[in-house]
């Protein structure tokens, strides 16, 4: 009898242990997190000076701010403060991680100028590359042709005029972190030039782009050292950027993938847009979806920087939008 009681007690304790273990397991069992696509809202929407030719050409992200460069063709409007210099001006503007303006600067001369790309050196200076219009050499006085002298049929025509400038002077502006120009470096070329990228490599900058005419263009590459000395032009093969491909960005422990236009996302069953929509998705190291955001407008560029997050530049109607999404790493 005593043996039976001990056996019964042992069985009861075993049952309690198993029940407690099962209960604990049920309480701690991981439940898959339901990820939804969140619509990103631009931190900054701007139409620059509101002129038809205004544009943002490039964007650069630091650990605390976002810089963007481009062209303005009219007088300054809020939130910008720098005054107009010439017909069209290059410019650089810097905003913080919330989209609030820090400073802006117009670049150029009284001629036409544009800014097309930007990089930073080790100190933190911004190096903005662009183009300035160089006045054409005048060999004789140019006058409008009188239509009545050569128009024997009496048809009304406009007087013929000769253009007095062209965008053939490549310019690099060195701007410090407070928005002051430190130096300007100029390189004359034989034709219309369009630098499309500038990158910093150890002790020098590498500038690439197109040069030639509207009929015939070729790629070029030129180097620039920290003292403003340009190397000789080197022919460079022009490679068209791929379209419709997925862009992967390493972001801390995670990986961000940018899809230029999708209707379905693996792992997010609730995502069912009616039209193709640009989306960024953050994946954990294990490959699980951690977060997802849809982006507004026509996306021009996407980048990520620790301290700021993901930064997307978009065309939204007649304006530009900069969306800053923190917490994707």
Report the location of each language-model feature:
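A sequence-level/structural motif corresponding to short, flexible coil/turn segments enriched
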Residues: 25-329
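Bacterial N-terminal signal peptides that target proteins for export
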Residues: 1-11
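Generic short amphipathic/hydrophobic targeting helices enriched at N-termini
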Residues: 12-14, 31
């Amino acid at each position: 009898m005593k043996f039976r009681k001990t056996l019964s007690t042992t069985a009861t304790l075993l049952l309690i242990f198993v029940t407690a273990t099962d209960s604990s397991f049920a309480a701690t069992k991981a439940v898959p997190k339901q990820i939804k696509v969140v619509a990103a809202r631009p931190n900054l929407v701007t139409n620059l000076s509101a002129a038809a030719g205004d544009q943002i050409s490039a964007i650069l992200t630091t650990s605390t701010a976002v810089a963007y460069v481009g062209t303005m063709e009219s007088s300054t409007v809020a939130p910008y403060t720098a005054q107009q210099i010439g017909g069209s001006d290059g410019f650089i503007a810097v905003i913080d991680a919330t989209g609030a303006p820090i400073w802006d600067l117009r670049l150029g001369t009284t001629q036409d100028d544009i800014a097309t790309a930007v990089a930073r050196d080790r100190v933190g200076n911004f190096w903005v590359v662009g183009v300035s219009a160089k006045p054409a050499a005048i060999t004789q006085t140019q006058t409008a042709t009188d239509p009545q002298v050569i128009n024997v049929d009496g048809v009304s025509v406009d007087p013929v005029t000769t253009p007095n400038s062209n965008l053939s002077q490549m310019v690099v502006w060195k701007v410090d972190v407070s928005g002051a120009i430190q130096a300007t470096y100029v390189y004359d070329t034989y034709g219309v030039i369009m630098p499309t990228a500038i990158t910093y490599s150890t002790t020098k900058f590498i500038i690439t782009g197109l040069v030639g005419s509207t009929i015939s263009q070729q790629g070029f590459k030129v180097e620039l050292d920290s003292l403003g000395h340009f190397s000789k032009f080197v022919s460079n093969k022009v490679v068209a950027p791929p379209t419709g491909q997925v862009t992967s960005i390493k972001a801390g422990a995670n990986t961000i993938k940018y899809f230029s236009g999708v209707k379905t996302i693996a792992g997010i069953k609730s995502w069912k847009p009616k039209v193709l929509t640009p989306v960024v998705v953050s994946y954990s190291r294990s490959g699980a979806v951690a977060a997802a955001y849809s982006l507004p407008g026509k996306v021009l560029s996407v980048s990520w920087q620790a301290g700021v997050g993901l930064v997307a530049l978009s065309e939204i109607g007649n304006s530009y939008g900069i969306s800053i999404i923190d917490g994707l790493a």
